[in-house]
Amino acid sequence: MAISIQTLRSFVKVIALINESDSGKFTAFGLDDAFHVATIGYPDCLFSRDQAEGVLGEGFCDDIPTRDDSQEILRWHNLHNELDEIYETKAFLKKLKIELTVFDLKEIRGGEAIHDFNMPVLKRQHATFDIIYDGGALEHIFNAPQALQNMLLLCKVGGYIIHSNPLNIFNHGFYNFNP
């Protein structure tokens, strides 16, 4: 599960679309209220400082902490030869005025909302998120129709669901989603 530079660009575009539809004009990240984003699994920020600042502007990353376990995570993603460090995801997104809720089966990084997406989400969670991001979890959930329904139920009317699932990676998860 990751936020790639392409995903970061998608977040910026979706936030611009939501801002535009709410106010009639693009206001970038100057909102008073945070965007509420839910992810299925903990998303590691898998992009470099130069890539992030190419999208968000020079100096954006100056005060964002990096993870103490960056090298371990980079090895797990097989990116230890490409990136030097990983930004702390919640801190990075908070600077974009994104309030992150991570749904997962168990607490791994800390602060996850524990839920099995094979089962229906709670009614009190319906329509509470502006953006739902699946960066590579759906193919690992056995009951894919229920997981998709959960994502739809969690998303506010007018919100967005972003999927970034692997294509043609055999023996990766339960499913291999294709066009």
Task: Identify what each model region corresponds to.
Residues 172-179:
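Short, intrinsically disordered, charge-balanced linker/junction segments flanking boundaries
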Residues 53-56, 114-116, 148, 177:
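Generic preference for flexible, low-structure residues
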Residues 1-107, 179:
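N-terminal accessory regions of S-adenosyl-L-methionine
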Residues 29, 37-40, 72, 81-172:
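Conserved SAM-binding loop
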